[in-house]
Structures are given as C-alpha cells and as structure tokens.
C-alpha cells in the first residue's frame, strides 16, 4: 500500500532495511522504514501484521522513474553507519548497484533538489557520480 499501488510506485524501503538488501549488513531492523507519497506527516509508526513500520513523507514525489534512485541516495547516507564491510568493499558494492540500475544523469538532475551536501560529497568522493549514464 505504501510502496506500490496496483499501477504505480509510490514509495520505497529506506534505512537499514535497504542497506541490508544491498548486502552491506546482516542487521535486520526492528522497525522497517518506508518513504512514501501516501503520508502527510514527517513520520509515524504503524503495525502491519506483527511488523512495526515507520512511514515518512517523501521530500519529492516518488514515481516508477525515480524510486530506486531516491532509495539509493537515501542509502548513501546510511551506509557508513551500518556497513559491516571494509569501506573499499562498501564503495565497490554501491558502484555496482549504480551500474546495475543504469541510473542516468537526467534522473539525478530531476531529484537534485533533495540531495544533501553530505550525499553529494560521497557521490563525488566515492566516484559514483561518474557512473551515471548520459
């Protein structure tokens, strides 16, 4: 409901859950974090079955075209905090993800208003900015 409707993407899994999906940590969160268009508040916790889920409003409208990139950009900020791998391996994993997803400079430009200074710095320092296709 908060990630995908029948016809379109409206959110994404964020935080340590995403870092885990990338294989950078074995930690599993007690509360899954979801960023979604379907939330008006800056964050609230709900229970889905027996799982606690924190839903937060998206800073920019999430769509089929930008959900994975927004998720990745959010993840950059979480990687150093949660990774269990050496930094070089962590960066290689993130670079591989960018290549695999074929993110474009145009997609990055469309969400540039929500990229934090710290995230922009990591995109450049880690060399990921050069992996975005023209």
Please give the residue ranges for each predicted region.
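Generic structural signal for residues positioned in beta-strands
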Residues: 33-34, 54, 71
């Amino acid at each position: 409901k908060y990630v995908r409707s029948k016809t379109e993407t409206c959110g994404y899994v964020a935080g340590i859950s995403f870092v885990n999906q990338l294989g950078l940590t074995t930690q599993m969160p007690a509360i899954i974090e979801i960023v979604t268009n379907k939330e008006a508040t800056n964050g609230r916790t709900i229970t889905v079955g027996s799982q606690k889920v924190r839903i937060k409003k998206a800073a920019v409208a999430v769509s089929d075209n930008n959900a994975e990139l927004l998720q990745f950009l959010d993840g950059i900020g979480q990687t150093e905090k949660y990774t269990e791998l050496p930094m070089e391996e962590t960066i290689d994993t993130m670079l591989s993800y960018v290549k695999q997803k074929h993110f474009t400079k145009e997609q990055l430009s469309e969400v540039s208003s929500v990229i934090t200074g710290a995230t922009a710095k990591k995109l450049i320092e880690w060399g990921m900015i050069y992996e975005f296709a023209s």
